[in-house]
Curated annotation (Swiss-Prot):
It is an enzyme of class 2 (transferase). It comes from Bos taurus. Its main location: cytoplasm. Belongs to the phosphofructokinase type A (PFKA) family. ATP-dependent PFK group I subfamily. Eukaryotic two domain clade 'E' sub-subfamily. Residues 391-400 are annotated as: Interdomain linker. This is ATP-dependent 6-phosphofructokinase, liver type.
């Protein structure tokens, strides 16, 4: 379905009925998925039924299966858990139970089932599907349904969404709930860090994941933990000595805390469990450190879903409905999943098979294979963790020196990138300098050499510890060149926003005049606006979306209490509408006005009328987002006046400008990890380039590929020369000419009930799992 026109789509679901249920352990984001499936189903003209209490409700029927309308799923996107309930069900594992379930579905004409749950729930759904024909035959012979009914509903379609905080399902990069669980873990680690530092303590943290170490691995990366235990990679024999040596070493270097992260399913080489108690006693006996154990438990399943989980679930929920509509008796039951930032469909049983293979490999002690089978994302995380945790200060120095600076406005994750870049540089033997206050600081010679321990504890700090300025190098080129010569700098790593990219472009264009600028340069895009060309995501935008989303959740709550109130919220981002659009999806906004999607007075009129209609229903609140520069005349004040006067007597209006709140507090797990990875990746690339351009005792780099922007593009991390990106950049509005996230706007409008054409909806292709699906961290 590359494109379908609106009228046709409005009826593609006509006469079809979709049932949606959540099963197994709950996960944050399930509600967003239920909401998206329900609304997309209604949008295409199908009937949608909510099945309460998972498979138990399916078997028992009656009041547990209710037809939903548009408002049934209003105001649930921000809630954790699942509002339709979930239960582990014994009855469904028996044939009688499944026969009862089939009867309950046929009674309501439901032949499409969307199951949101873990691998057990999805396997159950597939068994149900394969038995469907024979179950109906049994119902006919029992006289419960007629032959004709069995003919009409002869086929059951299944689409699965994986809801599991463990991220233990093969074929999908991220499962629903994983990112939120990481948020909970990082909140706890940040809180524990302060108490551990006060008392010089060691903490052993036990995180969930019986058979899968994903949460433990990623939180260890994002917190800079000293030691990690995961089931996929049991420690070598004699690990007790290595661990105690490492802990003693970091203490003697001046660290006041040690963090050890252990997955609940951690084992040693012989398959014997390693318990958090055992690790604690070991540290106390061998080192005499004051040690505490904290078991995180079900805290990890709780709380509000993160922005990533809300958007992921919404996207996958819509895709699941499309998959059900396009299913035929010959297509396999599918799982809708994410690969990079693209939705794909995978055959359900291939995924389940792969997931079983991992467990089998672990049982048979083929641990390296288990890590490979987990998929690209897991393996990359593991490799980068090993690289960072085993890095040492190099004994041998190279002749190279590099400088790191922050440019633009503060963005979360900058410090994580600086930390990993500094340590990677030092471990490769380079001399590493940091520059305070951006290009201006480079001109004023605010340059200092940095040591391993100077960046300790930077990972979880928000903002910019180096200090950052927006000034471009053009004004003081002479001074900058003089200081590059003075410190003999061979490479520049610039971490920052649009100014960082523009600044490096100016330096490259001045190479003809100054030989000193013929050095290796790399830009790590870091800005809440996500407006730097050469990457799909810039560092700090995930934190910004979460910050804006939390504010909007509170604003929505205020509007719900006041009744008949519309809030107009202004987001940052310059001309780039990324923040407004993505936050809009995450909070279920009624509209988001952005510069890239031009709107006129007709559109505004339609939106106000939509709002007036909405106030006649039981949802008496509205939320409209507006990017700060979406229109020169239709300002926030103009919108406020328009909505106020048009809504007179129906609703009243308030405005809220979020401002610098959006820069966020502590970085989100995504930004910590993304920053860490880009820092390492950039240094590896710069070292290779330096060795390649080193001639007769000096560095001379003037090729276009020696000054690049590093970024995530679809599924791979790529380096794009700044000179080549120039043609793809709209300098007047400071953003890329092409933006991938514009297709998300369709989702925003559909889920807010606008009559729009689906001609632009591109559905996910069916892929196969055996082609090791690459992922967000590919290439590390």
């Amino acid at each position: 379905m590359a494109s379908v026109d609106l009228e046709k789509l409005r009826t593609t679901g006509a006469g079809k009925a979709i049932g949606v249920l959540t099963s197994g352990g709950d996960a944050q984001g399930m509600n967003a998925a239920v909401r998206a499936v329900t609304r997309m189903g209604i949008y295409v003209g199908a009937k949608v039924f909510l099945i309460y209490e998972g498979y138990e409700g399916l078997v028992e029927g009656g009041e547990n299966i209710k037809q939903a309308n548009w408002l049934s799923v209003s105001n649930i996107i921000q809630l954790g858990g699942t509002v339709i309930g979930s239960a582990r069900c014994k009855a469904f594992t028996t044939r009688e139970g499944r026969r009862a379930a089939a009867y309950n579905l046929v009674q309501r004409g439901i032949t499409n089932l969307c199951v949101i749950g873990g691998d057990g729930s999805l396997t159950g759904a597939n068994i149900f599907r394969s038995e469907w024909g024979s179950l109906l035959e049994e119902l006919v012979s029992e006289g419960k349904i007629s032959e004709g009914t069995a003919q009409t509903y002869s086929h059951l379609n299944i689409a699965g969404l994986v809801g599991s905080i463990d991220n233990d399902f093969c074929g999908t990069d991220m499962t629903i709930g994983t990112d939120s669980a990481l948020h909970r873990i990082m909140e706890v680690i940040d809180a524990i860090t302060t108490t551990a530092q006060s008392h010089q303590r060691t903490f052993v943290l036990e995180v969930m994941g019986r058979h899968c170490g994903y949460l433990a691995l990623v939180s260890a990366l994002a917190s800079g933990a000293d030691w990690l235990f995961i089931p996929e990679a049991p420690p070598e024999d004699g690990w007790e000595n290595f661990m105690c040596e490492r802990l003693g070493e970091t203490r003697s270097r001046g660290s006041r805390l040690n963090i050890i992260i252990i997955a609940e399913g951690a084992i040693d080489r012989n398959g014997k469990p390693i318990s958090s108690r055992y690790v604690k006693d070991l540290v106390v006996q061998r080192l005499g450190f004051d040690t505490r154990v904290t078991v995180l438990g079900h805290v990890q399943r709780g709380g509000t879903p993160s922005a990533f989980d809300r958007i992921l679930s919404s996207k996958m929920g819509m895709e699941a409905v499309m998959a059900l509509l396009e299913a035929t008796p010959d297509t396999p039951a599918c799982v809708v999943s994410l690969s990079g930032n693209q939705s794909v469909r995978l055959p359900l049983m291939e995924c389940v098979q792969m997931t079983k293979e991992v467990q089998k490999a672990m049982d048979e002690k083929r641990f390296d294979e288990a890590i490979q089978l987990r998929g690209g994302s897991f393996e990359n995380n593991w490799n980068i963790y090993k690289l960072l945790s085993h890095q040492k200060i190099s004994k041998e120095k190279t002749n190279f020196s590099l400088a790191i600076l922050n440019v633009g406005a503060p963005a979360a994750g900058m410090n994580a990138a600086v930390r990993s870049a500094v340590r990677s540089g030092i471990s490769q033997g380079h001399t590493v300098y940091v520059v305070h206050d951006g290009f201006e600081g480079l001109a004023k010679n605010q340059v200092q050499e940095v040591s391993w321990h100077d960046v300790a504890g930077w990972l979880g700090r928000g903002g910019s510890m180096l200090g950052t300025k927006r000034t471009l190098p053009k004004g003081f080129m002479e001074k900058i060149v003089e200081n590059i010569r003075l410190h003999n700098i061979h490479a520049l790593l610039v971490i920052g926003g649009f100014e960082a990219y523009e600044g490096v472009l100016q330096l490259v264009e001045a190479r003809g005049r100054y030989e000193e600028l013929c050095i290796v340069m790399c830009v790590i895009p870091a800005t809440i606006s996500n407006n730097v060309p050469g990457t799909d995501f810039s560092l700090g935008s995930d934190t910004a979306v979460n910050a804006a989303m939390e504010s909007c959740d509170r604003i929505k709550q205020s509007a719900s209490g006041t009744k008949r109130r519309v809030f107009i919220v202004e987001t940052m981002g310059g001309y780039c509408g990324y923040l407004a659009t993505v936050t809009g999806i995450a909070v279920g906004a009624d509209a988001a006005y952005v510069f890239e999607d031009p709107f006129n007075i007709q559109d505004l009129k339609a939106n106000v009328e939509h709002m007036t209609e909405k106030m006649k229903t039981e949802i008496q609140r509205g939320l409209v987002l507006r990017n700060e520069k979406c229109h020169e005349h239709y300002t926030t004040e103009f919108l406020y006046n328009l909505y106020s006067s048009e809504g007179k007597g129906v609703f009243d209006c308030r405005t809220n400008v979020l401002g610098h709140l959006q820069q966020g507090g502590a970085p989100t797990p995504f930004d910590r990890n993304y920053g860490t990875k880009l820092g390492v990746k950039a240094i590896i690339w710069m070292s290779e380039k330096l060795r390649a351009v080193y001639r007769n005792g000096r560095v001379f780099a003037n090729a276009s590929d020696s000054a690049c922007v590093i970024g995530l593009q679809k599924k791979v991390v790529a380096f794009s020369p700044v000179t080549e990106l120039k043609k793809d950049t709209d300098f007047e509005h400071r953003m890329p000419r092409e933006q991938w996230w514009l297709n998300l706007r369709l989702m925003l409008k559909m889920l807010a009930h606008y009559r729009i054409s689906m001609a632009d909806y591109v559905s996910g292709e069916l892929e196969h799992v055996t082609r090791r699906t690459l992922s967000i961290e590919t290439g590390f």
